[in-house]
Curated annotation (Swiss-Prot):
The keyword Chloroplast does not apply. Induction: Expression is positively regulated by the sphingofungins biosynthesis cluster-specific transcription factor sphG. GO terms for molecular function: oxidoreductase activity. The chain crosses the membrane at residues 29-49. The gene is sphF. Residues 1-21, 275-298 are annotated as: Disordered. The sphingofungins A, B, C, and D, show a limited antifungal spectrum of activity but are especially effective against Cryptococcus species, fungal pathogens causing opportunistic infections in human. Its EC number is 1.-.-.-. This is Ketoreductase sphF.
Amino acid sequence: MLERPSFPRLGAGTRHHRPLGQTGEGSDWLLAFTGISGIAGMMIPYVPWGLIRAMQRGSIELTSPRGVWIFNCAILPSRLHRTVERKGNMKPDQDLFGKVYLADCLCDRRLRWLRKSDFQHTCCAWCQCHNIRTTAGPSSRCPERDRGELCGCGPARDRCRGGGYGRCLCGVGRIQIPTPNRGFPVLLRGGKPCRERVFHRSSSHAAGFLHEEQLLFHCVCGQGHVGYLGRGRQEISRHRRVDQRHHWTQTPKDCFRQQRGGVLGATRERCLYARQKRSPSPGRHPALGSPPAQLRQDHLHNPHRLSSRLHLAWVRPRTRHQTGPHEADPGHQRRHFRAAGGEIPVLGESGPGDRCAGRPRGFYYLRGFIGCESFVYEHGWVEPQERTWNCGFVVERGDGVVCGAGVEEEVGEDVQGRCY
C-alpha cells in the first residue's frame, strides 16, 4: 500500500518543517500582508468616488486649464445646478483649492475643470428632448416640444429681466449667463474657449451702440427681445422688441467693427453701406437694400473667400412633422446678406412684396459662419400671437454645400469635429 507523500505546509521551513504561525518566514509574510490590508482598508473612504462616477458617465478631462491634476469632486453637479438656479450668479458652494472647480457642463454632458475666474463659463444646453438634466431638473420642458419654452430657465416672467439668459454667440445652440462686471463670458467648448474671443468685456459703453467688444444677442424668452452687453453692468443693458411691422430689429446705427482674426468683418465700406437709408424695393431688403456692385461681384467671383463674411441663406420653415435637417427651398429665392451691422433682417410674416409670402410664421434664425462652423451671430424672432414650430436656418458654404441645419435638437450634441 502506497503512502501519501507528505508536503511541507505553506509557510513551513523546508529544513525543520516549522508550522505556520511560529517564528519563521511564514509569520513574517503574514504580518506584512495583514499590515498592508489594514492600510488599504483605512484608505478606502478616501477613494475619489466622484471621479469614479464621472468616469462611469463618460469621458472626463482630468487636467485643469492650468495643467494641474486634481482628483477632488466635492461639488456634485446636482448641487452646483441648484446653486446656479437659486443664486443666479454662478457662485460655487465650495472652493476647491481656491483655483479650480469641477462643473457639469450640460452642453455635452461632460465634467469640465473651471478656474474660479472662469466659473461663469458653465453652460447649460437646450433640452434636446434627450432627458438631459438642466438647471431646473429632469422635469424641464423641451423647447421643441413646448413651442419655444426654454429648459431650466424658470418662469417666463424672469427671462427678460436683468441678468437673464442669453444665447451664446458661438452658434452651437448653447446658453450663456451674463455675469457681473464681466459682460459676456467666453464659452468653454471642449475644454477650450471659442475659436475667436468675441465675448470680451466692452472697452467702452454707450447706450444704443455696438462697439468692438459689445455684441448683440437674442434673449431666449421667445418674445423677440434683443439685449446689448454693457461694461460693468449686472444686468442686460437693454431689450428691444422686434419691429413687427417691418420684421427686422431696430439695432443701433453703429456697425460691427473688424475683430481680431477677421470674425465679424465689417469694413468701413460695408458699415457705411449698411447705415444708408434706402427705401425698400422688390430687389432689396428693407434693412440692407442691395449690396454695392463691387461687393456683389467680389462675392460672385470668389465664392470660397469666407474669411470674414456672414453668408446667410433663407430656408423654408420647419414643420411639426419634419425631423431631419431640411434643405433650402428650391422655389424660394436665396440671397446672401451681409449682416455687418445696422438693421438685421428677420423674415416671417406674409405680406405684399415679402419674399416669404405664404410661408408659415415662426422662429427664424440668422447665422453667420466661418468655414464650416456656425458662428458669431444669431437673432431670433417669434410672433407672440402665434407660436408655431421652430423654423430652422442653415448656413451655406460658397461652393453650395449646406453645412447643416440651425435647429437646437440637431446641434446640441456631438458638435466636435463635424459640420452642424
